[in-house]
Amino acid sequence: MSIMQASCIALVSSLTLTVIFLPLLIKFMHSHHEGQEIRDEGPKWHQKKSGTPTMGGTIFVIAAVISVIWVTAWQHSLNKVVWILVISLLGYGIIGFLDDGIKLYYKRNLGLRAWQKLALQIIIAVVIVLIASSDHFNFGLYIPFAGVVHSVALFVIFIIFWLVGFSNAVNLSDGLDGLATGLSVVAYGTYAYIAFKQKNFAILAFCMSVIGGLIAFFIFNHKPAKIFMGDAGSLALGGGLATVSIMLNRPWSLLLVGIVFVCETASVIMQVISFQTTGKRIFKMTPIHHHFEMLGWSEWKVDIVFWIVGLVGSILYLAIWG
């Protein structure tokens, strides 16, 4: 069986598990009157989404983990790379699960405090570094225009920054029905293609497993969303993406492949700096998808335009660097 055939089985497995169990989670949350609390600072028309079931990411994360483990084990390819990817996805997913759980329990929009979330994110990143370093891991980091720099300290700092940064970047992008889901399908699809070209079955199977779960999740997450992925999904997706880019030895690719995630994060940083220094806001509201909403764009229009931008970023990367 070819690596693509086995990876497609992983995709179908993850998709099937998500389709089966996600409706059960939605039904459970409705029966217990559990749902997302919408922040007051967001667009006023988002308040009608209050009470929508959340934590849907828990299902597709578990589905992806189960699928990639059993398919790689079946193909005798369950190696350290698979475990690093699984720990990344599951580890950041657990942080998000705790965050979502606190929000639901206390019926508020605030979950883990910022320092608590950051500390846990750093711990997961350090665990990944420790696991990778136990197998003669290459700590060379390519710096654009400077070449490869061999520094363990620099590489460890970079991995922590990359994983924490992109887990939060995807989290910031999860503000509209289906937005982060579609963007993640494009990004993971791009890395699946790269992994296939490199004949890296572990990463290919992982990406396809995540894609399968996301495709199934989108059925319930497109506007009007029947369930949100919550931090359990968005933090996991971002952590997984960052780890995949590093394991493929192409970390900088994420600046183009994940260009929308980068722009969402940059808009928040720019807004804060501008307001703190000049008292003026650059955007009507951040993250930037809300800015376009405030300009009168519908959610579907924002989704489609942002998905296209994400796709163009991925195509540009593949066209230039393959």
Swiss-Prot record:
It is an enzyme of class 2 (transferase). One of its GO terms (cellular component) is plasma membrane. GO terms for biological process: cell division; cell wall organization; peptidoglycan biosynthetic process; regulation of cell shape. GO terms for molecular function: metal ion binding; phospho-N-acetylmuramoyl-pentapeptide-transferase activity. Keywords: Cell cycle, Cell division, Cell membrane, Cell shape, Cell wall biogenesis/degradation, Magnesium, Membrane, Metal-binding, Peptidoglycan synthesis, Transferase, Transmembrane, Transmembrane helix. Its main location: membrane. Its EC number is 2.7.8.13. PROSITE patterns: MRAY_2. The keyword Thylakoid does not apply. It catalyses: UDP-N-acetyl-alpha-D-muramoyl-L-alanyl-gamma-D-glutamyl-L-lysyl-D-alanyl-D-alanine + di-trans,octa-cis-undecaprenyl phosphate = Mur2Ac(oyl-L-Ala-gamma-D-Glu-L-Lys-D-Ala-D-Ala)-di-trans,octa-cis-undecaprenyl diphosphate + UMP. InterPro entries: Glycosyl_transferase_4 (IPR000715), PNAcMuramoyl-5peptid_Trfase (IPR003524), PNAcMuramoyl-5peptid_Trfase_CS (IPR018480). This is Phospho-N-acetylmuramoyl-pentapeptide-transferase. It comes from Lactobacillus helveticus (strain DPC 4571).
